[in-house]
């Protein structure tokens, strides 16, 4: 039988995915999510498929044997990104520049090769991303964190990963999956 903990974890996965994707502009309604969870929808919308991928990555991260000390490492963060985009069609891997003048292809699990602007924020240039991510991995090594500092580091690492914006697209989702 399913334990209460397993039931709550499953529910929280759906809720976290719903809000994480809503932040990104996904307009899926909660009633559609129920159909997704029941797997009773044959023709899934793009938004529903995004949420489904998000939940699948959450499950994968939860049940794979990921050593805790690896969570801030570049390979782990790249693996989150790769897992989220692994099942995308070629069309779903295209993003346009802010002026729609140019299209770029998302490379799952790879750092961006072009500069980006996020609102008023200009993340580090692409050639500096590996350096920033190397710093990130060493600054947030879990074995160096004790007591309450783990919680402060969790919040700070969430902010810092979003600030670095290492990928062409999916940074918000990757950051929230990382923090989850």
Positions of PLM-derived features:
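FIC/Doc superfamily catalytic core
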Residues: 1-180
């Amino acid at each position: 039988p399913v334990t209460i903990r397993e039931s709550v974890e499953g529910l929280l996965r759906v809720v976290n995915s719903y809000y994480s994707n809503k932040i990104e502009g996904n307009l899926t309604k909660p009633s559609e999510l129920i159909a997704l969870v029941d797997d009773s929808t044959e023709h899934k919308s793009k938004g529903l498929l995004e949420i489904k991928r998000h939940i699948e990555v959450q499950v994968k991260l939860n049940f794979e044997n990921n050593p805790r000390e690896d969570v801030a490492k570049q390979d782990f963060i790249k693996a989150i990104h790769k897992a989220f985009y692994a099942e995308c069609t070629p069309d779903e891997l295209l993003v346009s520049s802010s002026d729609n003048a140019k299209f770029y292809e998302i490379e799952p699990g790879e750092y961006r090769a072009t500069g980006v602007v996020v609102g008023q924020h200009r993340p580090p240039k692409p050639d500096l991303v590996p350096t920033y991510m190397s710093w990130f991995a060493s600054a947030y090594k879990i074995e160096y964190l004790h007591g309450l500092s783990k919680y402060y580091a969790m919040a700070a690492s969430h902010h810092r990963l979003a600030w670095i914006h290492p990928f062409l697209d999916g940074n918000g989702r990757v950051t929230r999956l990382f923090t989850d």
